[in-house]
Regions:
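Selective transmembrane-helix segments that form parts of the transport pathway or gating/packing helices
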Residues: 1, 39-40, 44, 70-98
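Central hydrophobic cores of alpha-helical transmembrane segments
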Residues: 2-5, 298-310
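Terminal transmembrane helical anchor/hairpin motif
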Residues: 10-27, 99-100, 104-261, 308-388, ...
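Long, hydrophobic alpha-helical segments
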Residues: 31-54, 58, 89, 93
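Hydrophobic/aromatic residues in alpha-helical transmembrane segments
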Residues: 41-48, 61, 96, 285, ...
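Helix-loop-helix units of permease transmembrane domains in multi-pass membrane transporters
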Residues: 51-81
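Hydrophobic residues within alpha-helical transmembrane segments
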Residues: 80, 84, 273, 304-305, ...
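Cytosolic-side membrane-insertion boundary helix
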Residues: 256-277
Length: 398
């Protein structure tokens, strides 16, 4: 608690923002509550890694074999104690953050409802193979490798909008059904990533706006709605390029619709609960390692696993698969994909990032985190840990 208060007192004077209010809020949320959350995860994970190992090394588990103790007392008790500590620290952290004041309401963020990357990649593969100008080395490559490469690159696929043309992307109906406050967030680019002038018209159902700015910037475009606009519209975000140059964007990354959600305090509450779910999973993982390994080895293994979990998504993003990739690099990518898939329960929730960007932590995402990170995964890990504890205790008695 004292360290949390110290972080809220000292860190705001150290970190620097871009000078804007929005930038200052984002930097504060990432630097102060984010740092408290990160340190809490590492500290409780290391603590959990030593609980059972220390009891085993001091022969207390051998006594548990003489006077049988339930798995709840051996493992669920320490887990609940660690989670209670985390809940107190996170609640204190949230209280200090909200008391600072000056926060803005959060917003729902909607992405376009596009075809799955696998389907889009298959269609693109058919077009590539049907093109007579496709190199022979591409035609002779295994289809599964080509498909894997296209799926990985689908998220960064650009679409071009020439002057006088328009492009549309479907969105959920609720994105255009709100009474006010609809914003289109778009990042335009050019062929050589050069800064250029931009002008056009953005429409979403009954909402519309005229945009005149520059490319290479993330634009938040407030949309307005005529008072006499009736029914009969579709929820498609359309952009008509009225400028003189072709603009480009990535539909899966650069196009979003924002609508009002609720207050920052409610979003902070949901984000804190999501943080607690992740901490619960980490504590259960630490207790599981503690039953099988000595304390130093368990702590080392847990910290390495935590670092690899955070690095795997970045590796997949920065080093995409190519046809001429060496076998050793392909093996590394396969391992990174496996790690990213296996640890998605921990790396998936991004409560600090959502708070910093003003994104609403949805109740559905919180429910998924609570079910997977706080219930299912800890039950599985602690059940395995309880089995190992009883086996070790029985072996010591024998």
């Amino acid at each position: 608690m004292a360290l949390t208060a110290l972080a809220h007192l000292l860190l705001p004077a150290i970190v620097r923002s871009d000078g804007t209010e929005a930038g200052g809020r984002e930097v504060f949320l990432r630097a102060v509550p984010g740092s408290v959350y990160m340190v809490l995860c590492v500290a409780l994970l290391a603590c959990a890694c030593g609980l059972v190992a220390r009891a085993r090394e001091s022969h207390r588990l051998a006594l548990a074999a003489v006077r049988p103790v339930s798995a709840g007392a051996l493992l669920f008790g320490p887990l609940l104690a660690l989670v209670a500590v985390a809940a107190l620290v996170l609640a204190f952290n949230a209280g200090l953050t909200c008391a600072r004041g000056g926060w803005t309401d959060c917003r729902h963020v909607y992405a376009p409802e596009l075809d799955p990357p696998e389907k889009a990649a298959r269609q693109m593969l058919q077009e590539i193979l049907a093109n007579t100008n496709t190199p022979q080395e591409v035609r002779s490559a295994p289809r599964h490798r080509l498909l894997s490469i296209l799926i990985g690159r689908e998220v960064d696929r650009y679409e071009s909008i020439p002057p006088g043309r328009d492009m549309a992307w479907p969105f959920p109906d609720e994105a255009a059904s709100v009474p006010e406050g609809v914003v289109a967030r778009i990042r335009f680019s050019t062929q050589f990533n050069m800064r250029a002038s931009l002008s056009g018209v953005v429409t979403l159902g009954p909402w519309s706006a005229v945009v005149s700015n520059n490319t290479q910037s993330v634009l938040e475009i407030p949309l307005s709605r005529p008072p006499d606009q009736g029914a009969g519209w579709d929820a498609k975000l359309k952009f008509r390029n009225t400028g003189k140059s072709t603009v480009m964007l990535r539909p899966r990354r650069d196009v979003e619709v924002l609508t009002p959600a609720d207050s920052f305090g409610m979003n902070m509450l949901r984000a804190t609960c999501e943080m607690l779910c992740v901490v619960t999973f980490l504590c259960a993982f630490g207790l599981f390692l503690s039953t099988a390994l000595s304390r130093p080895v368990a702590v080392f293994t847990a910290l390495v696993a935590l670092v690899v979990t955070e690095m795997a998504p970045a590796v997949l993003e920065q080093y995409p698969e190519t046809l001429d990739l060496p076998l050793s690099d392909r093996i590394g990518l396969w391992l990174s994909r496996g790690v990213a898939f296996a640890t998605s329960a921990v790396s998936g929730p991004q409560p600090v990032s959502d708070l910093a960007t003003g994104t609403c932590v949805e109740w559905s995402a919180l429910g998924h985190a609570a079910l997977v990170d706080a219930v299912v995964a800890p039950l599985v890990l602690l059940s395995l840990a309880a089995y190992l504890v009883r086996r070790r205790a029985s072996a010591s008695r024998g």
